[in-house]
């Protein structure tokens, strides 16, 4: 892996330049497969060059930021690749975002244009009134759209008119920004994490060499391409190493193995929820008719790990841990059930990653009498941190566009005076052998349906809807569900909250995965001396009506309403008879 990075550094190569070498090597090899169409490396190169020349002719230059907002498709890749060839930095926006979250994602990086898919025109229209601070913002649409709805220019016309020759007016640098990937981080609205060419190369090389991916391997990912998982970890194998890759616009559990067979995939990608959905499908012959030799990803729970491997005959699992923006990353290459990676206990100080003790209530690092952090012993949960070395592309931390957000993720004087480390915001545990296991998130962010949910964002939205009433949002565990389901506790002694209005406004303002599934109505909410509302005890109590005496409600999606949650309902949710 390091040899690959050194080679790229010597050549000062960009992602686009590496891809062009692959095109010359095998122009007619299948590059990306989507639905029933196969794109060759030459076709991807030509289309991305047309994108580059199109936007260069329109006046976009190196350093300009442009939002890319569309569902997963081949053009999503060719557009960001093409823009990068002229130094324009694409902001890859979550296609589930709406209204304020969408507008914030666009304005936070001062985008000069929005490239959107015709399938998302309504979302763009709804967010447009919130984008007034961006003067002269231009809109470009790929696919069908009504100019009366959005005054956009058609890329279906502009791109084919452009030259397929490589753009000649820009020479990039591997330390340039390649694109932005949005992450909720630990608090607040979505943050734009900076992905440089060097980081894309490092992440891709890590997956490639640690999983021993060969030239003949074919990948399949059904994960969204705006995410690091699908958009970098899988597609980097295609763009940097020449592997063919099949993609899907939206994940389908019933079609997963059909796609693997169709594309003749040998490697597939997962997240924990995806594995559970696939496992819940009725058994069928296709379960073992595929050629998959490796599945890699994150979040495969120990409780279903062996069952998944046995039923679908998967020889190898590459469970990994990492974050979009961080430098603290590990991978399990030993098929150790439940482990996300390994860290030697023999000489822990030479490792660039570590576990440090944190306060269970505040999440703050615990320091010794020298003012330094304390490493965890085996069995102790601690926050995973990565040592920052600015001169090393593997160990540097580029952070976010927002510098204040970046500073919050850096801890100083971690193990020696003057050093710096990246705070992952996650609790891990190491066993006696050195294997690492994911425990929980330390901050307010929790994961549901494969997405990070920022409690601060949801709390802010609820506060506005309820005219600034006190509320806290947190994640609660639900049996046989990955991640945590959102729950809100609202201070409402007089029970004036209209849950119908609340739900209607939340559906309009938040992505579906961020809408709380449980509601608790409290007389008061306990606060700290600095007026911060406490949620640790609320989270521990979960949504169990035998423990909680406050009124409880759950979201019945069939009826589209919050309904009372009693003991029978609770048991039905826990047993899976009621699906969230």
Label each region the model flagged:
Residues 201-218, 226-266, 281:
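Conserved AMP-binding/adenylation subdomain of ANL enzymes
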Residues 142, 510-533, 549-577:
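AMP-binding/adenylate-forming catalytic domain of the ANL superfamily
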Residues 7-20, 28-73, 77-81, 98-107, ...:
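Conserved AMP-binding/adenylate-forming core of the ANL superfamily
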């Amino acid at each position: 892996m390091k040899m690959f990075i050194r080679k790229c550094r010597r050549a000062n190569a960009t992602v686009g330049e590496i891809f062009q070498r692959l095109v010359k090597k095998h122009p007619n090899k299948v590059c990306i497969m989507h639905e029933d169409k196969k794109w060759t490396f030459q076709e991807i190169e030509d289309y991305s060059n047309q994108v580059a020349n199109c936007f260069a002719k329109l006046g976009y230059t190196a350093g300009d930021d442009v939002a890319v907002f569309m569902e997963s498709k081949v053009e999503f890749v060719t557009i960001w690749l093409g823009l990068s060839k002229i130094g324009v930095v694409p902001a890859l926006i979550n296609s589930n975002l709406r209204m304020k979250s969408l507008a914030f994602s666009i304005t936070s990086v001062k985008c000069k244009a929005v490239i959107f898919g015709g399938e998302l025109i309504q979302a763009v229209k709804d967010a447009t009134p919130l984008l007034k601070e961006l003067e002269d913002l231009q809109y470009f649409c790929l696919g069908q759209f009504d100019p009366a709805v959005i005054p956009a220019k058609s890329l279906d016309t502009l791109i084919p008119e452009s030259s397929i020759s490589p753009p000649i007016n820009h020479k990039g640098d591997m330390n340039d920004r390649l694109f932005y990937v949005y992450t909720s981080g630990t608090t607040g609205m979505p943050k734009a994490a900076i992905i440089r060419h060097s980081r894309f190369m490092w992440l891709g090389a890590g997956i490639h060499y640690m999983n021993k991916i060969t030239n003949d391997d074919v990948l399949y990912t059904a994960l969204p391409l705006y995410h690091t998982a699908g958009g970098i970890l899988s597609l980097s194998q295609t763009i940097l190493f020449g592997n063919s890759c099949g993609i899907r616009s939206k994940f389908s559990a019933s079609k997963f193995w059909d796609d693997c067979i169709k594309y003749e995939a040998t490697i597939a990608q997962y997240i924990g929820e995806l594995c559970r959905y696939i496992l819940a499908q009725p058994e069928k012959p296709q379960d073992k008719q595929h050629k998959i030799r490796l599945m890699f990803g994150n979040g495969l729970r120990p409780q279903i790990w062996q069952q998944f491997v046995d039923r679908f005959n998967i020889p190898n699992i590459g469970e990994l841990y990492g974050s979009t923006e961080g430098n603290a990353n590990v991978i399990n290459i030993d098929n150790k059930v439940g482990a996300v990676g390994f860290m030697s206990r023999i000489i822990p100080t030479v490792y660039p990653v570590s576990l440090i003790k944190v306060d269970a209530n505040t999440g703050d690092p615990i320091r010794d009498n020298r003012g330094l952090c304390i490493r965890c012993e085996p069995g102790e949960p601690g926050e995973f941190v990565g040592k920052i070395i600015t001169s090393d592309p593997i160990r540097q931390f580029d952070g976010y566009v927002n510098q204040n957000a970046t500073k919050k993720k850096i801890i100083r004087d971690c193990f020696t005076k003057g050093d710096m480390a990246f705070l992952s915001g996650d609790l891990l545990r190491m066993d006696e052998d050195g294997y690492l296991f994911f425990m929980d998130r330390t901050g307010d962010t929790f994961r549901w349906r494969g997405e990070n949910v920022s409690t601060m964002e949801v709390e802010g939205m609820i506060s506005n809807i309820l005219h600034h009433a006190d509320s806290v949002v947190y994640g609660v565990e639900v049996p046989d569900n990955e991640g945590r389901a959102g729950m809100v506790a609202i201070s409402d002694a007089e029970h004036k909250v209209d849950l119908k209005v609340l739900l209607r406004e939340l559906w309009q303002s938040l992505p579906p995965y961020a809408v709380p599934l449980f509601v608790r109505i409290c007389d008061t909410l306990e606060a700290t001396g600095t007026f911060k509302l406490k949620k640790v005890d609320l989270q521990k109590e979960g949504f169990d009506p035998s423990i909680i005496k406050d009124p409880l409600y759950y979201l019945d999606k069939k009826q589209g309403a919050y309904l009372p949650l009693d003991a029978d309902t609770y048991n039905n949710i826990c047993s899976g008879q009621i699906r969230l």
